[in-house]
Amino acid sequence: MSVTNILFGNSTPKAETDDQARACLKLLSGRNHMVLTAVALIAPDGREASRLVETRVQFKHLSLQEHADYLAGGEWRGKAGGYAAQGVAGGFIIDLHGSYSGVVGLPLYETLNLLHGLGWVPAGKAVP
């Protein structure tokens, strides 16, 4: 699985430093961006299935204090785009069209559909 944030045609990295996180937040503040999540699976018999999931995320305009507080909290470390939608930064999201779980990490609905298409049966369920 690969996750990439796209903002104005550019990929945003996983933030590892305060400066990287600050730059990401500055770009995201008050704007829309796309989160693209690719899922690829290979069944034991070699069959393959893949899906690209696109999610549009709209951030509110962040005040200088919100920037400073979020950076001080450290939640952004190692996060694509410098934010964690499942945490404090979820409060910065005005609108989201697509897969919330894809923004957080793994697009569950789409992944389960791929698995079912390859014949996966959940544990405890009878095989027809």
Regions found by a protein language model. Give the residues of each.
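Anionic-ligand binding patches
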Residues: 1-128
